[in-house]
Amino acid sequence: ISFPEKMEWYFGLLDEAARFCIGVEPSSTVGHMPNLYCGAAILLLLFLYLLNRRIRIGAKIPRLLLVAFFFVSFANNKLDFIWHGFHFPDGLPARQTFLFAFLLLTLGYEAVREERGNSIFKILFAFLLAELVLVLCFRFTDLEQVTPEQMLLTGLLILGYALLLLFYRRK
């Protein structure tokens, strides 16, 4: 197998973001779709991480660039080829998703750990950004891989997590 000559994109980034919804069917071969679900709260916590001023910008930038690199590499054939040891995967696509999930959960933990940097406004803004991602996914993605009901349930869970953070913040 040789290195791909032409760069191709397997799917759009919003199609990929829709994989964060609860109940999405795990992908094993079709369409190279990565299995990204690592909790509905992660969308909220990722935006809280971004907004939290108690987390140094020098720590945020490389970590968020790594998140972006992972996200792009799931959808790009050349990066996917490199991630799979210079072979195209046979069977389970995007085998590096466990590293991506670990990174996201680590960032989410840091956002919660630095809870003093999560003002009520920032929690509400992070909630709105997370819900905006879901609305964009609903509007612009292929609804065969994720149903409106799954998106709605994910949005309700994010609302619940935001309310828990607001309640915890008040104490």
Model-derived features with residue positions:
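Periplasmic/ER-lumenal interhelical loops and adjacent helix-loop junctions
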Residues: 1-62, 69-70, 76-84, 93-98, ...
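Contiguous transmembrane helix-bundle modules in multi-pass membrane proteins
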Residues: 64-78, 87-171
